[in-house]
Amino acid sequence: MSFFKGYVKTRDKRCAEKFKARTDFKTLEQVQSLDEYAGILANDAVLIDVDDGDQAELLMDIVEHLQLNCRVYQTTRGKHFLFKNNSGQIQKCFTHTNLGCGLTADIKVGLKNSYSILKFDGKERFIEWDIEPGHEYDELPKWLVPVRGSTEFLTMDAGSGRNQSLFNYILTLQSADFTVEEARETIRIINRFILKDPLDESELDVILRDEAFQKRSHGSRSSTSLDCL
């Protein structure tokens, strides 16, 4: 799979030529000598743009720990993470949106005529992470899709209501069509990588027990408490 269906000349990170409703894009060989160019995202590609340096490193830690088959470009402020979007679970672009895992990012999809700057100011962006030859890129993990509402997991520490916040977050994830297992995986990722002071495994098991999901599917955010389990 190629993440790009072609390339275009850019100027100050803006396209210097038309690219919508077009199929005759330049090849990589035709743009490599330029000081600046971009790749037009393929229809089955999605780009997670994390401009905050600290948050980009957190997401990179998750990618490395899970050994995800994706591509990661270093940018001037953060990182770009590219995945497949074959299932079409992301249908539009987002700006400064909350991801399921508790981070904030911009999202670009090839379905909406999006592009990614690959060379700027005479320097090609470094590919920090990529698949091995013969491997396939992964579909975008569910914990990277946008969710409504925000919980400041990044700033939480001991005594700030982490347990109840994670428990409440189950409803947010279920409202975004996360399955039970997808929600469990997401909350475990938040606990391990996003919280400054993670809960121990026994506390997490209480939050993620089966009864929590049964109650949340029939209750409301205001009426259900972790203490009720």
Predicted feature locations:
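Basic, alpha-helical nucleic-acid-binding regions used in initiation and control of genome expression
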Residues: 184-229
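DNA replication initiation modules
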Residues: 41-55, 60, 84-186
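Conserved short hydrophobic interaction patches
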Residues: 65, 174, 190-193
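Positively charged, low-complexity intrinsically disordered regions
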Residues: 12, 126, 149, 163, ...
